Amino acid sequence: MLTLILVLLILLVLAEVWTLLLRCRRGHPGWKLLRQYRYAHRGYHDKPHIPENSMAAFRRAIEHGYGAELDVHLMKDGRLAVIHDASLKRTAGADVLVEDLTAEELKQYHLEGTQEQIPLLEEVLPLFQGKTPLIIELKAERGNHAQLAEATCAMLDWFRVNYCIESFDPRCI
């Protein structure tokens, strides 16, 4: 009985330590800045005029004082597309995967029946320099998590943007 109690206590302590390790690091210097903003999910969009994850949606978010959340996919040429879905079907009407395209090929598609093109991360980041922060969600596909994370970090090194990176694939973080 004593052994069982000791095992349960050890498991309880380990669970508590694990919980503490997973807590957000609120002491990080950037945390206070990020918490000062509200965020426009996929930019400040409205159908049918301003599509999600478009340059117009990001400009509108900044104009209204919002930070923005955006999604990033790695393309076959190593460039980073800003789009939520792995496929262009819902947002651009084409049954093609983002990761199977190059940046040049991506430019032929338009978002949701508008003239807005699917932006590259390198086009979006300058909008946010010295302005509102970004929440960047990494969307890994087919095991490209390491390349996606490396390409995103390399791109962020070129711009003075306040940001937070998130992903539902823990291998990206």
Q: Model-found features: residue ranges?
A:
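Phosphate-group recognition and catalysis centered on beta-loop-alpha active-site segments
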Residues: 2-173
